[in-house]
């Protein structure tokens, strides 16, 4: 089994952990409906950039058919 030659310094430990920080996800408000959603994602109503992309009623009818 591999064993390190010498102990890692706090500086090296910090540099290794520098990419582990948690970041809050950025939320946006839709222009048409005012619904809150993740950036670059479609809303639950089917809107993206203020335009209707997906019609839920048609999708439900396709699934049930």
UniProtKB/Swiss-Prot annotation:
Keyword Hydrolase part of the UniProt annotation: no
InterPro entries (UniProt xref): Ribosomal_bL32, Ribosomal_bL32_bact, Ribosomal_zn-bd
UniProt KW keywords: Ribonucleoprotein, Ribosomal protein
Region: Disordered, residue numbers: 1-32
Pfam family, one: Ribosomal_L32p
Keyword Nucleotidyltransferase: no
A molecular-function term among this protein's GO annotations: structural constituent of ribosome
GO biological process, one term: translation
GO cellular component: large ribosomal subunit
Biased composition annotated in UniProt, kind: Basic residues: 1-19
Family (UniProt): Belongs to the bacterial ribosomal protein bL32 family.
Record-linked HAMAP family: Ribosomal_bL32
Protein's recorded name: Large ribosomal subunit protein bL32
Originating gene: rpmF
């Amino acid at each position: 089994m591999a064993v390190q030659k010498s102990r890692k310094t706090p500086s090296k430990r910090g540099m290794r952990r520098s990419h582990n920080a948690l970041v809050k996800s950025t939320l946006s408000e839709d222009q048409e409906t005012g619904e809150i959603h993740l950036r670059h994602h479609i809303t639950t109503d089917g809107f993206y950039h203020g335009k209707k992309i997906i019609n839920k009623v048609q999708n439900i009818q396709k699934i049930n058919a």
